[in-house]
Amino acid sequence: MDILIKIIYYYNYLVLFYFLIIVTIYLLLNAISFRNISRYTKKVKFVELKEIFRIHNFKPITVIVPAHNEENNIVQSVHSLLQLEYPDYQLIVVNDGSTDDTMKLLFDHFHIRQSSFSPYYEIKSKPIKAVYLSSAYPNLVVISKENGGKADSINAAINISKNPLITVIDADSILERDCLLKIARPFMENENIVAVGGTVRIANGCKVNQGYVEDVGLSKSWLARFQVVEYLRAFLFGRNGFDFFNGILIISGAFSCFRRDALVSVGGYLTGSIGEDMEIVVRLHKELRRKNKKTKVTFIPDPVCWTEAPETFKTLSSQRKRWQKGTIESIRLHKSLFFNLRYKWMGMLVFPYYVFFEVFGPFIEISGYVVFFISLFLGIVPLNFAVVFFSAAFLYGTVLSTLAVCLEELSFKKYVRPKELILLIITAILENFGYRQFTAWWRFRGLLEYVIGKRSWGKMERKGFENNGKPGYSPAMR
């Protein structure tokens, strides 16, 4: 019994030590993020985007939209994507074995006809049945292929495209009109950049018209509001901070841009993966650096994409478990990066961070709650210590989230009404009472399910921005 009490006693200090380390890391990332965003906003204000593309040689882009059973939003989505601001871009819609009217709607609304184009398979994908061109929109291409999933659809489109830049989005992503101008800029400024990600925002509560966010607002759902703050914190602080170390391991599957030659050189997306958006980024870092090529994956803090967040516990739970499984899978597949000096900051700092705090973090957090309350019940930990610890954790979480809201307001000002800013700050406080614990529990369940071999992808049920969505490919903060 004495041994068990000692284990419980010292485990509490282990959790406290873990908490202090992660607080230190987050404070460092926050300081770096404030500096980076301040510099970025000054640079963006100094020169107009369109002026840059008039002066410099721009790189043509291919926008890839995997679509499986997207009959409820495919027409509006394609119409809006055809109106993006960019000098030269191609739009490829991949019909991934849809069993609904997705293909029929594309025929009816975009005047597509089958071409004689024969694809050259530089990377492996399911067979392409046909390639269609539009008589009304010269830059629109539609691919019909056997069902193989999102990653396989992207690979098929890469085989068709010959443009140097590849942008991948979800069929239900809502893009800013100038998103391609913003996402392509880093490729023009640095030839070593192989991938760029941008900030994804929550569209729940926003007014959407003709495929674009017309008025930014907040959802009436507290679950959606919690995710707004969560996304602000993850993108403006987390990814922006890691960008300083060239340590971005995840680019959101809802909107990302890559150099085509880099994707082809590593064999394209991994089909059958739970988290293909993270795996491809980690593999780019690993394989290109192994070949001694100077590479950089970077992040722009601009809000370039809007996505629908789950508003039910069931759907949100499924999403977070899937994200956790995807993270574990990517870490397991590329474990050779762990404390590997060859990969510098990536191997010695960023990858270990993901192992200790993203993979095993949920276990430590959930077990920490359990052991802590057992300690209180048995009198191992004094009540005043517990009060101080939980107060510090609450204060830290609130400050971190509130800083993210303030940084958004100072830099991008998407939420212009005072009522919404007040609501966001209230949300930043309330998320510490339940929401954060639920997300830790869902991630912990994702870890357990992965360990026991339950690695299914699952569905992401959506209401849709016009209240008529159906399940399809899931958008993600990832």
Question: Which functions belong to the PLM regions below?
Answer:
Residues L28-H56, S330-F357, G361, S367-R478:
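Juxtamembrane C-terminal module of membrane proteins
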Residues A262-S265, S273-T298:
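A short, conserved alpha-helix in the catalytic core of glycosyltransferases
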